[in-house]
Amino acid sequence: MVQNFVPEAVRGDTRVLLVDGEILRVNGHPAAFRRIPSGSEFRSNLDQGGTTAQAAIDEGIERSVQRIGPVLRRDGLFFVGLDFLGDKVCEVNAFSPGGVRAAYRYERVDFTSELLRLLVQRWTTT
């Protein structure tokens, strides 16, 4: 895949976990975290030396999720991780979303139990 360079990449990206097209939240806390590149590296991937930090879900990300959520739901993508550069989606992680533990580190709520509850609910009602 080739894409134009997005200047926001130098400040890192935000991973947001979605379930059934909506941000996974527990007690109002979003399952999300920031990935920050190290040094002169623009990629924020942890394997490239990036670090994590608490994320803020702003209106731009909320609007993007509202637009893409119904498409994910329609296509049967129940649990995904969306990576954002600013308010632009730069990657959809559909097969291995990852990040529940990192989100817990900053929000200190049990996203795993809620995710499992929603997965069981999904598979027992369909």
Regions found by a protein language model. Give the residues of each.
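Phosphate-binding site of ATP-dependent enzymes
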Residues: 1-61
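ATP-dependent carboxylate activation and anion-phosphoryl transfer catalytic cores
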Residues: 55-126
